[in-house]
Amino acid sequence: MKWLPATAVFAAVLPALTAFGDPASVEISTSHTGSGDPTSDAALTGFTQSSTETDGTTYTIVGDITFSTFTNIPVPVVTPDANDSSSNSSKGGSSSSGATSLIRSSNLHSDFDFTKDSVLDLYHLFFPSASNTLNPALLSSSSSGGSSSSSSSSSSGSASAVVAADPKGGAAFYSNEANGTLTFTTDSGNPGSLTLQNLKMTGDGAAIYSKGPLVFTGLKNLTFTGNESQKSGGAAYTEGALTTQAIVEAVTFTGNTSAGQGGAIYVKEATLFNALDSLKFEKNTSGQAGGGIYTESTLTISNITKSIEFISNKASVPAPAPEPTSPAPSSLINSTTIDTSTLQTRAASATPAVAPVAAVTPTPISTQETAGNGGAIYAKQGISISTFKDLTFKSNSASVDATLTVDSSTIGESGGAIFAADSIQIQQCTGTTLFSGNTANKSGGGIYAVGQVTLEDIANLKMTNNTCKGEGGAIYTKKALTINNGAILTTFSGNTSTDNGGAIFAVGGITLSDLVEVRFSKNKTGNYSAPITKAASNTAPVVSSSTTAASPAVPAAAAAPVTNAAKGGALYSTEGLTVSGITSILSFENNECQNQGGGAYVTKTFQCSDSHRLQFTSNKAADEGGGLYCGDDVTLTNLTGKTLFQENSSEKHGGGLSLASGKSLTMTSLESFCLNANTAKENGGGANVPENIVLTFTYTPTPNEPAPVQQPVYGEALVTGNTATKSGGGIYTKNAAFSNLSSVTFDQNTSSENGGALLTQKAADKTDCSFTYITNVNITNNTATGNGGGIAGGKAHFDRIDNLTVQSNQAKKGGGVYLEDALILEKVITGSVSQNTATESGGGIYAKDIQLQALPGSFTITDNKVETSLTTSTNLYGGGIYSSGAVTLTNISGTFGITGNSVINTATSQDADIQGGGIYATTSLSINQCNTPILFSNNSAATKKTSTTKQIAGGAIFSAAVTIENNSQPIIFLNNSAKSEATTAATAGNKDSCGGAIAANSVTLTNNPEITFKGNYAETGGAIGCIDLTNGSPPRKVSIADNGSVLFQDNSALNRGGAIYGETIDISRTGATFIGNSSKHDGSAICCSTALTLAPNSQLIFENNKVTETTATTKASINNLGAAIYGNNETSDITISLSAENGSIFFKNNLCTATNKYCSIAGNVKFTAIEASAGKAISFYDAVNVSTKETNAQELKLNEKATSTGTILFSGELHENKSYIPQKVTFAHGNLILGKNAELSVVSFTQSPGTTITMGPGSVLSNHSKEAGGIAINNVIIDFSEIVPTKDNATVAPPTLKLVSRTNADSKDKIDITGTVTLLDPNGNLYQNSYLGEDRDITLFNIDNSASGAVTATNVTLQGNLGAKKGYLGTWNLDPNSSGSKIILKWTFDKYLRWPYIPRDNHFYINSIWGAQNSLVTVKQGILGNMLNNARFEDPAFNNFWASAIGSFLRKEVSRNSDSFTYHGRGYTAAVDAKPRQEFILGAAFSQVFGHAESEYHLDNYKHKGSGHSTQASLYAGNIFYFPAIRSRPILFQGVATYGYMQHDTTTYYPSIEEKNMANWDSIAWLFDLRFSVDLKEPQPHSTARLTFYTEAEYTRIRQEKFTELDYDPRSFSACSYGNLAIPTGFSVDGALAWREIILYNKVSAAYLPVILRNNPKATYEVLSTKEKGNVVNVLPTRNAARAEVSSQIYLGSYWTLYGTYTIDASMNTLVQMANGGIRFVF
């Protein structure tokens, strides 16, 4: 503001001018300058402007007026320096020798009035050398007013201070009228300036003294500089109000000094600076309070156009001067009436130079008015600074000399820049408000307020480098602090305090609201030069000493040590902290404290809401809460940006933040919550939250907004790189709950105890760690020296997580997760627990009970490990999962895999149990109701030792009980292993590893569709191994029941049980396959020690299993036989029950590779049942070679049940099969087959009536050497096909019945043949053997009677294939004279009869080409008619998808060259095309046609039916072009190329001979079609009709592959091919009809269809039986035909079209009909 209108000036000063009548008016147009010498200045009569008007005086300043260089301070008396006798005097002006001692008093004001004489008397009493005469202008009839201070001046050296007898101020202007207002104004048209400088007075107000109000208005400049008062008000003093307003340019107070209050001004009532251009207080000094301004009332500064500056002002209480020994009191002084403080002060100043001086103990300071408060401003009431541009408080200080004691009852505690005994309000700043470099002796380095502090509407607030020796380096308030509505920046930087609150201390609450950018940086609290005595972490919050009751001062020497209370490096609140509406950032950075709360300390609740970027970074605390400490709950709501705690550190708990015991952190709707790189020397590297930490998002729709279909998620949590020396590297809490978030990440956190990322605490029946409804949860790269590399807690629940990753964490137990109680994982769409490491148990997860349920997506537990190099016997469990209770996998619907996990001891010397490479479950593991494949792959339990006395077990799973049941998708165990470095089976005292995939006390696999064990390895039980974990109860049992199929493939064992090892094994109602398994010793598929039951409900196959060693050494050397199943019991037989009641059982190619022996079952075995029901079989293609521990042979009934009418097969057709079953066998039901070269040895064999025994060539049925026993058979089927010699091979091997040699003959050794012998011709060609062209003796049985037993063949009846309708005919009879070594059949030849001749036609095989060609043309017609022909090329360039149904019918009537032939087909076409340009179309189609053909009877003896199914792929295109000379008529080109693959099958029936032929063959076909058309008549505006001429070339080529008939007298046909080129030429007419929004587009065409090129397909055939050959020629259609076509399209709006075409081709004897219909969609 340069100039103000006159009306504005008048309005501003009107209240002061009209308060008490009309004041006197004085114009001042002359400057005044004194000499600076008190004697000379006393003689000046016109210098001081005195007002005696009761209504005051108005001074009009004309021009630039200056009052300068005036003093009434006596020249001090200089005495010789005691240390320098040569010094006689001291020269120079007046100066202070030290601050006056202040007396403890509540009232320093005196009502005693001096008369002139009394003043002179008192003056001469203390100054005997002074003149007897004083200038009246320097004397007052009364004391100088209400100053509560006394002062002195002094000189340097040994000069004594001199004080005037009557202190007086007002060197320039003086008014003693209480109601008289001194007003300073000017001419508004030519404003003047007033400068008061270098005025030094003994009384109050060196330049101006007024008992009434004081008003400055309308001046150009107002300047007070270099003025000094030995009392209060270094420049001006008023006991009324001070009003300074409408100053055009500047108001300046610089270098003013007072020994009392108000270094520049002292105001008893309200102080107002208003409507100024600028206001400046600089280098003003007060000896008591208010270095710049002191007011007993309020201070208001408002409407400052430019700047407000308070720079280098001081309120400094000096050390007292030594108190001299007083002389005897003068009779002139009445001690009862003179102000005590005045006398003491003056006496101290006026002591004669020769008087001795005695040191005095400093007097305590007892009032806030004298305690050095307010380095720039002191106000006993409120302060308001508002509506300004810039405000600066810089380098102001409030101090008390260190030798002085501030009474503990004193309210005042400094305020380096501002002190207010009430509230402070600074508001409406458009520029910058700066508090910088201010210092306070105690609290409030910048601001000290007894009341509330409000900083509002400040564009830039900067509080930097303020310091105090108490609390609140920048701000101290005994009530609340509010900072709100900041437009740009609020910053607290570099502030320090020694106690609490490096920047801010508030006894009340702190509110930060509606600010843009708030930063607290590099603030510090604490005494860093003294040792730290930390308070205990659980002590009550420190409260300011000023809030406690007053107590007597305690001498410093006697004071007890004080616990360091330096809390809150930047901020301290004894109530709460409330933050809201921060739009850019609230940052606490690089702050530090020596106790709790390196960034902030909040005693009660901390609430932050609706803000952006709350951040605590790089703060330090010597106790808890490196970033934040809160004594109550913390609530964060609706925060955007990163809510960040980063690189903070604490010496105790909570590197980032810490809360008091029992308190919680609740966060709702945060965009990002980050704990990063914080450290704590105890718990909670990132955060220590003793009760609950909750982070969630709550979505509330607006009133008009519909509820969301799916609850939205929002926000993230990032806990990364934090470190705790104890537990909870990221977070330490009792309960943690995260929900409704987009992501939660715990990464690279470290703890030296438990919970590398997160530690929660177990609570009874309560989940203490939960993650619910979150998109991504990542727990990665965390480390704990103790347990829980990622998470440690009691009970955890992960629910409705889209993506869960637990990866690369490390710990002693629970590398990823460690829980003392349960873990529940459910509804996790995608999950991964991978690459985690533990040194004892639970590489991925460690918990008591674990439930993985309702997982709809992909979930993997992969590459986790428990790995260590053991030096002590510490058991290692659970590479992927460890459970001290039960593990349950249920209702999993996505893909699930436990892969690549391991538990391993890398040491080679120390033994330990190593179990559960994938999962270790102490009590049970259950996998049930899963409808996704479950994969266990490449898991391992291993030791580097070559032998071990401990148990290595369970490469994938280890548990007492494993149950896998009621799943609907495959369960797969692939390449898992339990192993040591052993190369041979364990010796006595050592243990084999067990269970490459599963090791358990009991295993139950039931009601699953498919289970696969492939490539697993262990030393026993390559896939499944049973271990006694319960001392035999329940028994070690494997139960596999009610499954669809179970596959054991390529599993291996070093010892036995390549697939399964157990005591009791039951495979029932399950299809199972054991293929390619191996072991070193017998039992390559199954090794069983008690009982084995095999009762499948579909096929049970043992195939290609291998034993690799020749012998196995236990107590004795045992030869390996290559047994797939081995009974491993050295004391008794194991029992085996084979039941094929619902599915067949096969043993095939099970081999001992070292000896090339094949064996299905071996060991000490007793068969309790071998049962096969009707249609089922038990097939032994490998030998059964069992032994027994029983003394007497046991009974065995084959097919004992009446329903067991199936087949039991022993076959030697693949390799030698000598089966030994040392039991007494009764064959009760069904069919027993001894296949080619198979041998069965039993103790005895008895065939029950109604059964059949089929014996193949070379088969042997023998008794056994264990006991004597006979063979009794009564219904035998003999495969005769290979026991009748041929002309080329006379050597044959009939079946053999054998009695083994015995030392002592026994009558039980006998052979008895009765009943029926059925001769079987399985290939139907026995009677084509020319060997039967004469009488022959054919051996029916060879008899090997080494036991010399009885052999009888009585009542034997022959049946079966005893003759044929064709071939060699004769009769068979049993030779009654057969010798003891053979049973002979005699053949008597009768005649030879040929096949009956049936004439057969062949052309219908070739006629199928017609059906193939017709399917190609039908598809082509659909493409042309539906898309290429009807979709006009002037249409817009849209894309189309279309689909149509196809139908065709071909009928060939009988003619002289062929029989009738019909073909009908149906199918579909699906196509998509595009128009890159309007005139060009390109598309592709896929078609399938399912056709059937039929020929009628011929010669009444055969009928032919067939089918031809085609699959076709087509490309089609169309384009418009013009002939070069004719541009008026476009030519439309259309082309189709189709490839087809056809499959044909036929059946020809010959009823007369009850025979048939069947044939199957393939054809490959191509079609190429090119059409050109031109419009002869185009549509007109009045007609949509169009006439078009078109011609096309249609070429088809079909190649039929060769094939051979089956069944009756088969023929072999060669391949052939057919090509056909037709040139359809014709006309078409089309037009459109419209009805409402529907357009109907119709078209009719007719064409002549000549065939101009074709070939006649020919094939050759050969009759296989007679080698007769011939040719087959196709009957060709006629060359000329006609084609008619009708099509229609219905346009249903812009996108959908219905269409259809019907085409008919007619020629002589042939009619072909083709139809297409479908729908088209434009996109």
Swiss-Prot record:
GO cellular component, one term: cell outer membrane
Listed InterPro entries: Autotransporte_beta, Autotransporte_beta_dom_sf, PbH1, Pectin_lyase_fold/virulence, Polymorphic_membr_middle, POMP_repeat, WDR48
Pfam family, one: Chlam_PMP
Region (Disordered): 78-100, 139-161
Subcellular localization, as worded in the UniProt entry: Secreted, Cell wall; Cell outer membrane
Keywords of the record: Cell outer membrane, Cell wall, Membrane, Secreted, Signal, Transmembrane, Transmembrane beta strand
Signal peptide: 1-21
Record membrane topology: Peripheral membrane protein
Keyword Signal annotated: yes
GO molecular function: ubiquitin binding
Record-stated family: Belongs to the PMP outer membrane protein family.
Protein name: Probable outer membrane protein pmp20
Gene name per UniProt: pmp20
